C-alpha cells in the first residue's frame, strides 16, 4: 500500500494524535514537496477515508499548494493541536472542511463552530467553507456510478 508507516515513525505512532498534519510535510516519504506556508492557498480539514482519496488525487495532479489536515478526535475538540497545525497558514490560505457524507450528516455540524472559533482566536478574518455532498435524506446515493461521480466532484472542487 502507498500509505504505510515506517519503522522510524513507530515511536510517533505509539500515542494517539488528535490532529494529523499532512504526510507530505514529512520529507522522508515520497510524496510531492509542498510549497512554503506563505504560498499554500488552501488548507483542507477532514476526517476519515476522504483524506486518502484527496491525497492520492493531489499526488496524481502534482498539486503543491494545498495542505490536508486530519482531525482524528472530534470530541472533546482538539483546539490546541489544531491551532498548532493551522497557524503557519492562517494569514494566507483559505480554510475548508471536506467530508464525503452529505452536509447534514458526517462531522460538519459538530466541528464547524470549533474550527471557526480556532480561526477567530488566531485572528484570521476568514470563514470556514464546506465542500461535500449536498444535504440528503439518505447517507448514500444507492448507485455506485452516482457515488463515484459525486466523489470525483468533491475532489475536483478541492483541487481547483
Tell what function each PLM region has.
Residues 38, 57-67, 88-93, 118-127:
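Secondary-structure transition/capping motifs at alpha-helix termini
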Residues 14-25, 45-51, 72-81:
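A general structural motif
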Residues 85-88, 99-160:
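Peripheral docking tails and interdomain loops at the edges
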Residues 51, 56-89:
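Generic long, charged, amphipathic alpha-helical segments
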Residues 36-42:
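A short, charged/proline- and glycine-enriched loop
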Residues 6, 28, 52-55, 77, ...:
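Short helix/loop capping segments that flank catalytic or ligand/cofactor-binding pockets
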Residues 45, 94-102:
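Short glycine-rich or small-residue beta-strand-to-loop segments that form or flank ligand, phosphate
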Residues 1-8, 12:
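Single conserved hydrophobic/aromatic residue that forms the stacking wall/gate
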Amino acid at each position: 500500500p502507498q500509505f504505510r508507516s515506517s519503522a522510524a515513525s513507530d515511536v510517533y505512532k505509539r500515542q494517539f494524535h488528535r490532529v494529523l498534519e499532512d504526510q507530505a510535510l514529512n520529507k522522508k516519504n515520497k510524496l510531492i514537496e509542498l510549497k512554503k506556508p506563505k504560498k499554500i492557498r488552501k488548507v483542507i480539514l477532514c476526517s476519515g477515508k476522504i483524506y486518502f482519496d484527496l491525497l492520492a488525487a493531489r499526488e496524481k495532479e502534482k498539486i503543491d499548494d494545498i495542505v490536508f489536515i486530519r482531525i482524528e478526535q472530534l470530541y472533546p475538540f482538539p483546539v490546541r493541536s489544531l491551532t498548532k497545525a493551522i497557524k503557519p497558514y492562517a494569514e494566507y490560505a483559505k480554510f475548508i472542511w471536506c467530508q464525503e457524507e452529505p452536509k447534514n450528516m458526517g462531522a460538519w455540524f459538530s466541528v464547524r463552530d470549533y474550527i471557526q472559533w480556532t480561526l477567530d482566536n488566531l485572528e484570521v478574518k476568514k470563514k470556514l467553507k464546506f465542500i461535500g455532498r449536498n444535504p440528503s435524506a439518505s447517507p448514500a446515493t444507492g448507485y455506485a456510478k452516482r457515488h463515484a461521480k459525486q466523489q470525483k466532484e468533491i475532489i475536483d472542487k478541492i483541487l481547483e
